[in-house]
């Protein structure tokens, strides 16, 4: 989405290669030039699920020039353990060039409403208000988001179901002998060898996953954690797609 947003504004983007399927913060800092205006960082990252702790992330933000805006996309933050969840909003007082982006589409379960929010310095908010689209999020979506924001019990239950589903899929992949990237989100990046072939086989079996060749990961598929029966269906279909003798075990 970041390249698309960049191109839509007529800007030129610089993609910094990943390191160990995660962000290379040192390389990102080195890639900043006098022409750089915005840096996007997703944490936890999509589609790899890798995560950078708060101390390292704040150090990165502190080293970005003040005239460059840092957009910290924390769409999957609620899936982290409570002790690991980001405190980046408290950094804005020290780094007025920081925008923290959150969404209600993941742990809050409001994906169909397409609503999220950004927290930033008032001066940055004023600039965004001048250029944003004239039609804002509809009033029903706003009301739902406000109600969801106050329902901490639901969010914690959502995170718990996700942790249990993650363990279920990880155990199933281990039985199939399939490698995956440990994830801090609500999905797993799974190494199936030939992503396009296995994606097509799963689709024929009625299971939809996400191919990620466009991220430079043609051997992988991204699999969202579902309910227990959905996870089992995926694992069985994956076993069939891979021709595993354990698929029907």
Sequence positions of predicted segments:
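PLP-dependent enzyme catalytic core of the Aspartate aminotransferase-like
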Residues: 55, 59, 201-205, 210, ...
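PLP-dependent aminotransferase class I/II
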Residues: 97-181
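Short acidic/glycine-enriched loop/turn segments that link adjacent beta-strands
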Residues: 112, 184, 216-219
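Active-site pre-lysine segment of PLP-dependent enzymes
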Residues: 7, 23-34, 47-70, 74-107
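PLP-dependent aminotransferase-like
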Residues: 1-41
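Short beta-strands and strand-loop turn motifs
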Residues: 13-16, 38-44, 70-74, 181-183
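Conserved PLP-binding catalytic core of the aspartate aminotransferase-like
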Residues: 18, 162-163, 171-205, 221
């Amino acid at each position: 989405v970041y390249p698309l947003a960049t191109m839509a504004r007529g800007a030129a983007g610089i993609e910094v290669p990943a390191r160990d399927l995660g962000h290379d913060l040192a390389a990102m800092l080195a890639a900043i030039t006098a022409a750089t205006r915005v840096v996007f960082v997703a944490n936890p990252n999509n589609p790899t699920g890798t995560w950078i702790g708060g101390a390292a992330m704040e150090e990165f933000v502190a080293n970005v020039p003040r005239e460059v805006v840092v957009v910290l996309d924390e769409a999957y933050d609620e899936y982290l353990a409570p002790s690991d969840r980001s405190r980046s909003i408290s950094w804005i007082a020290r780094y007025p060039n920081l925008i923290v982006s959150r969404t209600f589409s993941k742990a809050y379960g409001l994906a169909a409403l397409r609503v999220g929010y950004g927290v930033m310095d008032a001066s940055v908010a004023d600039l965004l208000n001048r250029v944003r689209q004239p039609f804002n999020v509809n009033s029903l979506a706003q009301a739902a988001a406000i109600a969801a924001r106050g329902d901490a019990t639901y969010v914690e239950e959502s995170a718990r179901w996700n942790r249990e589903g993650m363990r279920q899929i990880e155990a199933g992949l281990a039985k199939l002998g399939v490698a995956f990237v440990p994830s801090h989100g609500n999905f797993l990046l799974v190494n199936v060898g030939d992503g396009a072939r296995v994606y097509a086989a799963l689709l024929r079996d009625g299971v939809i996953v996400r191919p990620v060749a466009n991220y430079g990961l043609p051997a992988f598929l991204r699999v969202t954690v579902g309910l227990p029966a959905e996870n089992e269906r995926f694992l069985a279909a994956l076993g069939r797609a891979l021709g595993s003798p354990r698929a029907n075990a």
